[in-house]
Design a protein with these regions (language model features):
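Hydrophobic alpha-helical membrane segments
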Residues: 1-225
Length: 225
C-alpha cells in the first residue's frame, strides 16, 4: 500500500472524530505544560515569588520527570486510540484514560518505553543513523503489545524488528511526508499541531494495520503448510 493511500485511510478514519482527536491532543498539551506550571507556582509560594525566582527549583525538575514517566501509558494509549479509529471502532476520551485502571499494563508500557529508549540511545552512541534505523525498527512495539498483551517487552521489540524488515524506508518516507504540514503549523504558533498530530498518528496506525498485521496471517499460513 502506498503512503498516499495510508494517509487517505487515516483521513477517512478521522472523519466525524476530529473533535475527539483534537480535544485529546489539547488535554495532553494542558497536562504536560499547565500542570507542572501550576505546581511550580504553588510550591514557590505564589505567582509573585515564582516570577521573581532566577532558577527552577530542583523539586520542580523532579516533578516534571515523574510526570513524564507517569504520562507514558497515556501517550501510548493515544496511539491505540488511533488504531481503533483505523479499525473503524468508536473510541472516546475516557477509554484512553482507562489505561490507568490496568496497573500491570501501565507499568509494562513504562518499562517498554524506557527499555526502547535505552536500546536506541546505545545504538546512537555508534552513530546517529544507526540510532534512527533502530528507532524505526522498534516502532511497532506498542501496537504489538496492544494486539498481543501476552508478549514480553523483549518479545515485542524482537517482533517489531522482524516485521519491519523491508519497510523501514517506507516508514521513514511516510514521516517525511508530514514535514510540509509541520512547517505550516509553525505559522499557526503550534495550534495546527492539534490537528496534524492526530493525522500523522492515525497514518502510523494505518501503516501498522495494513502492512504489519497481515504478516501475522502469512506466518500462520507458513506454519500450517
Amino acid at each position: 500500500m502506498r503512503i498516499s493511500e495510508l494517509k487517505r485511510k487515516a483521513l477517512h478514519s478521522l472523519g466525524g472524530k476530529w473533535g475527539t482527536a483534537v480535544s485529546l491532543m489539547l488535554l495532553l498539551f494542558l497536562i504536560n505544560l499547565i500542570l507542572p506550571l501550576i505546581v511550580e507556582v504553588i510550591g514557590s509560594g505564589g505567582f509573585s515569588q515564582w516570577f521573581m525566582q532566577e532558577e527552577t527549583p530542583v523539586w520542580s525538575d523532579i516533578f516534571s520527570t515523574v510526570l513524564s514517566i507517569a504520562l507514558i501509558p497515556l501517550t501510548i494509549s493515544i496511539t491505540w486510540f488511533y488504531l481503533n479509529l483505523v479499525r473503524e471502532g468508536n473510541p472516546d476520551i475516557p477509554e484512553v484514560f482507562a489505561i490507568y485502571k490496568d496497573g500491570r499494563t501501565s507499568f509494562k508500557l513504562i518499562g517498554a518505553s524506557i527499555l526502547q529508549g535505552i536500546f536506541i540511545f546505545l545504538w546512537s552512541l555508534l552513530l546517529i543513523i544507526p540510532g534512527i534505523i533502530k528507532s524505526i525498527a522498534y516502532s511497532q512495539q506498542f501496537f504489538l503489545l496492544k494486539d498481543h498483551p501476552e508478549y514480553t517487552v523483549l518479545e515485542a521489540i524482537t517482533e517489531s524488528r522482524k516485521r519491519m524488515k523491508g519497510l523501514k524506508w517506507k516508514y521513514f518516507l511516510m514521516h517525511l511526508s508530514f514535514i510540509g504540514w509541520g512547517i505550516l503549523c509553525m505559522f499557526t504558533l503550534g495550534i495546527g499541531l492539534l490537528w496534524l498530530i492526530p493525522y500523522a498518528g492515525t497514518t502510523v496506525a494505518a501503516f501498522y494495520n495494513e502492512l504489519i498485521v497481515p504478516q501475522e496471517d502469512f506466518d500462520d499460513q507458513q506454519i500450517e503448510v
